[in-house]
């Protein structure tokens, strides 16, 4: 999934962490430990930056492949569509025949 370079970086990172976790038997000095830490940090940063770059490029490609949704074709609505004069004056509910309207 990560590719051969990513796998190599992970193996180097795991190997370095395992070597540092073992007790110091005067084979590795403090300066070398610091060098290994710096190398591990660099490798980890390269791995993560490559991963985020590929992830961003995949997102951009996915965005390019998504077609724009078609705009709905809704006719413009009329403010008062074919209502009688009384209904246009009072667009409320009419109670009873020829009596009053209630808003």
Swiss-Prot record:
Function as written in the Swiss-Prot or TrEMBL entry: Somatostatin inhibits the release of somatotropin.
The gene coding this protein: sst2
Keywords: Cleavage on pair of basic residues, Disulfide bond, Hormone, Secreted, Signal
Keyword Secreted tagged: yes
Protein name as catalogued: Somatostatin-2
Lineage, top ranks: Eukaryota, Metazoa, Chordata, Craniata, Vertebrata
Prosequence residues removed at maturation: 22-87
Superkingdom, taxonomy of origin: Eukaryota
Chief localization: secreted
Family in the record: Belongs to the somatostatin family.
Pfam families listed in its UniProt record: Somatostatin
GO molecular function, one term: G protein-coupled receptor binding
Signal peptide location: 1-21
Gene Ontology biological-process annotations: adenylate cyclase-inhibiting G protein-coupled receptor signaling pathway; regulation of cell migration
Compartments reported by the entry: Secreted
């Amino acid at each position: 999934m990560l590719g051969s370079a990513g796998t190599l970086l992970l193996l180097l990172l795991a190997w370095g962490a395992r070597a540092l976790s073992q007790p110091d038997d005067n084979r590795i000095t403090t300066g070398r430990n610091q060098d290994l830490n710096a190398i591990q940090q660099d490798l980890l940063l390269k791995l993560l930056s490559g991963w985020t770059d590929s992830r961003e490029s995949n997102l951009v490609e996915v965005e390019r492949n998504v077609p724009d949704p078609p705009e709905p074709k809704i006719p413009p609505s009329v403010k008062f569509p074919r209502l009688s004069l009384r209904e246009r004056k009072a667009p409320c509910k009419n109670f009873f025949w020829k009596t009053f309207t209630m808003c």
